[in-house]
């Protein structure tokens, strides 16, 4: 009986964390589209909740990815703050609706593509030893999302393309594992990524 009670409590907590991740995740994507620095703070909360969910589900690549998100959130806060100061020094107001953009070089694209392929293969082999039920798919999403996050920190508009791909696959991955709240979150992310690209394209200003 005690075992069943613990399992029930664990299920309740897990569902709560999924819903919490969904809510904060939606807030995060709205702030991301508007390019508000607060998104990084919300992202920290979202990542912690997602880490809980993925660890309990045995999706260790996704768990590791959200750990990476915590680190990049700190870097993002610093990087974006510096860019805002740079715009202010140039005499432009950050809150005028302008989205800061940077040019994506062919070298960055090539290195990123190599990182996605190599990273997916290596991580998938590790995940197989950890009995990850979806090792290659989970690994591909993790590596692709890691690159997309770094592109976000660097303010490359092409990061939205990577998010559309990663979030679509993540929706399928979570649904296949019965994580319906998480699947809903990633489906919302995919749609929001399309909206985000359109918004950045319309309001973007290249600063470097």
Can you describe what each PLM-predicted range is?
Residues 1-12:
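Short, Lys/Arg-enriched N-terminal segments with co-localized hydrophobic residues
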Residues 12-35, 39-40, 46, 83-91, ...:
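Polytopic alpha-helical membrane-helix bundles and their juxtamembrane interface segments
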Residues 18, 23-28, 36, 41-76:
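Early transmembrane hairpin module of multi-pass membrane proteins
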Residues 68-90:
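Membrane-water interface of transmembrane alpha-helices
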